[in-house]
């Protein structure tokens, strides 16, 4: 009876296998035929992927990044001390057509076109089918193609997570002045657009001079991070209530100097050492060394009434509903740099690994 309730409205596909890009041991990906994922919780949905973005975290995870954390999570979840994070299917977001739904899913039905994000503990979207929680899906904006919309969910979720930590939202963004390091990249360009959609007072973004046009179009004031005058320009735009690092640089670390003093200002970085420290030292010691680095990074800020924190990609149902609405209203526009075919994914990984993109790389499945 329980099984029937969980699988209510589940419609099986014609095949029991699919093609997926798989990392077997953390040394890259290869295209394989693997079992089709199945719904095993009543709130999940099975999606037929139409397009997916490629993000630096996908490339890193295919090379073993996060193996200690994810391996430990799998052991706890499965109650199996021998469980491993491999084989791994990367990919954290997609656009798709709903193939089937669990028994508790009432807001989606087979045939619906959606945008979706997938938690890192689940097999990813660089496959023909994927399972995720229905709360991490939203209707694909009708004015966007599958390819364009696929550029939105992961970067929006990451930026939203950082702004949640910084206590910036639609309710208070109008009073905020924000500095974004890496404004032309995937997360940076989305962060600018979220802030503009929320009515943020002032946004300054560092980027290469060749990306000034993109940053200006999105609604931010560009500053060339390679210029000798970069620090002086930031001082002229200061003070900032919030700083977001989407890249790691000396300028990003220095920019604590342009935050407001004794105003509870926040510096957030999505470039966290946590996963690498755990991969290097194991989970317990990795947590300790990360905490030490966090303390070292934030101590001086606390002395002046400011604080520092790391942020991570975290799926959010609240964000997904906002994202669809903003995209349909034209307040958020996908920034797609390059589109490649499903069988070109290794080439896409190589491109994204260079970390010099002006927008997103998207994989089109058919």
Swiss-Prot record:
Picking any one GO molecular function of the record gives: NADPH dehydrogenase (quinone) activity
Q: Which InterPro entries match?
A: ADH-like_N (IPR013154), GroES-like_sf (IPR011032), NAD(P)-bd_dom_sf (IPR036291), PKS_ER (IPR020843), RTN4I1 (IPR037397), YIM1/Zinc_Alcohol_DH_Fams (IPR050700)
Q: Which GO terms describe its cellular component?
A: mitochondrial matrix; mitochondrion
Superkingdom of the source species: Eukaryota
EC annotation from Swiss-Prot or TrEMBL: 1.-.-.-
Which chain regions cross the lipid bilayer?
none
- Effect of gene knockout: Under hyperoxic conditions or low temperature (16 degrees Celsius), lifespan, body size and fertility are severely reduced and sexual maturity and egg hatching are delayed. Slight increase in the number of apoptotic cells at the embryonic comma stage. Also shows strong susceptibility to UV irradiation and paraquat treatment. Does not show increased sensitivity to X-ray radiation. Increased sensitivity to P.aeruginosa PA14-mediated killing. Body wall muscle mitochondria appear enlarged and abnormal with less developed cristae in hypoxic or hyperoxic conditions.
> GO biological process annotations for this chain's record?
defense response to Gram-negative bacterium; embryo development ending in birth or egg hatching; innate immune response; positive regulation of growth rate; regulation of multicellular organism growth; response to oxidative stress; response to oxygen levels; response to superoxide
Tissue expression, as annotated, is: Expressed in pharynx, muscles and intestine.
Q: Which UniProt keywords apply?
A: Mitochondrion, Oxidoreductase, Stress response, Transit peptide
Q: Give a short account of what the protein does.
A: Plays a role in oxygen metabolism in the mitochondria by regulating the levels of reactive oxygen species (ROS) thereby conferring resistance to oxidative stress. Involved in resistance to P.aeruginosa PA14 infection. Regulates lifespan.
Q: Which family does it belong to?
A: Belongs to the zinc-containing alcohol dehydrogenase family. Quinone oxidoreductase subfamily.
Protein name per its UniProtKB record? Reticulon-4-interacting protein 1, mitochondrial
Per the UniProt entry, what species is this protein from, by scientific name? Answer: Caenorhabditis elegans
């Amino acid at each position: 009876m329980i099984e029937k309730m969980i699988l209510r409205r589940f419609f099986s596909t014609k095949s029991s296998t699919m093609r997926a890009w798989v990392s077997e041991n953390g040394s890259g990906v290869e295209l394989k035929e693997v079992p089709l994922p199945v719904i095993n919780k009543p709130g999940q949905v099975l999606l037929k992927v139409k397009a997916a973005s490629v993000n630096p975290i996908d490339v890193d995870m295919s090379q073993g990044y996060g193996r200690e954390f994810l391996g430990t999570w799998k052991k706890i979840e499965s109650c199996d001390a021998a469980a491993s994070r491999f084989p791994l299917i990367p990919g954290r977001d997609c656009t798709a057509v709903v193939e089937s739904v669990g028994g508790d899913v009432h807001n989606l039905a087979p045939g619906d076109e959606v945008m979706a994000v997938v938690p890192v503990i689940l097999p990813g979207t660089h496959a023909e089918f994927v399972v995720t929680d229905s709360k991490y899906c939203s209707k694909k904006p009708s004015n966007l193609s599958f390819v364009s919309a696929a550029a939105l969910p992961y970067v929006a979720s990451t930026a939203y997570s950082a702004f949640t930590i910084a206590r910036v939202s639609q309710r208070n963004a109008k009073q905020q002045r924000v500095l974004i390091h890496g404004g032309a990249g995937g997360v940076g360009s989305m962060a600018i657009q979220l802030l503009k959609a929320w009515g943020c007072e002032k946004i300054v973004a560092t980027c290469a001079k060749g990306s000034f046009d993109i940053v200006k179009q999105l609604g931010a004031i560009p500053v060339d991070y390679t210029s000798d005058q970069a620090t002086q320009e930031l001082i002229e735009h200061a003070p900032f209530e919030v700083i977001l690092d989407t890249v790691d640089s000396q300028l990003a670390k220095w920019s604590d100097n342009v935050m407001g003093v004794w105003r509870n200002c926040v510096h957030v970085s999505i470039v966290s050492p946590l996963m690498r420290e755990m991969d290097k030292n194991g989970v317990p010691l990795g947590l300790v060394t990360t905490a030490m680095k966090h303390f070292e990074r934030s101590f001086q800020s606390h002395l002046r009434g400011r604080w520092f924190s790391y942020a991570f990609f975290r799926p959010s149902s609240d964000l997904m509903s906002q994202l669809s609405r903003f995209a349909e209203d034209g307040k958020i526009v996908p920034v797609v740099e390059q589109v490649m075919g499903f069988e070109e994914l290794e080439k896409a990984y190589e491109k994204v690994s260079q970390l010099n993109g002006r927008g997103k790389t998207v994989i089109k499945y058919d």
